[in-house]
């Protein structure tokens, strides 16, 4: 067996996350350790990019904090991620939504895809 695959399986977290794509609005709950205290912080925003494959897969989430856009990159297999929740399913035609960086206000909205539950 390949040594890389053995190492990937050893460090895999084994968590099951929902499937999502660029344009979806997600809430990521991740653990933050400050000194000897640990807390869970929620980060809600639009997925603008999914990159990599396997255990190196990562996604970028963009949110507006006041008037400043904040982007954060999360590795999918990170042990610090508690959960990922898909809030809205977006309707976009691109895999990488870098054009959202230049848009502000209502122009930066993404159409919502209706999902039958």
UniProtKB/Swiss-Prot annotation:
Signal sequence, renumbered to the chain: none
InterPro entries associated with the record: Ribosomal_bL19, Ribosomal_bL19_CS, Ribosomal_bL19_sf, Translation_prot_SH3-like_sf
Keyword vocabulary terms for this entry: Ribonucleoprotein, Ribosomal protein
GO biological process: translation
A single Gene Ontology CC term: cytosolic large ribosomal subunit
Protein's UniProt keywords contain Ribonucleoprotein: yes
One term of GO molecular function: structural constituent of ribosome
Alphabetized PANTHER family for the sequence: LARGE RIBOSOMAL SUBUNIT PROTEIN BL19M, RIBOSOMAL PROTEIN L19
Reported function: This protein is located at the 30S-50S ribosomal subunit interface and may play a role in the structure and function of the aminoacyl-tRNA binding site.
Homology family: Belongs to the bacterial ribosomal protein bL19 family.
Protein name: Large ribosomal subunit protein bL19
Organism field: Bacteroides thetaiotaomicron (strain ATCC 29148 / DSM 2079 / JCM 5827 / CCUG 10774 / NCTC 10582 / VPI-5482 / E50)
Upper lineage: Bacteria, Pseudomonadati, Bacteroidota, Bacteroidia, Bacteroidales
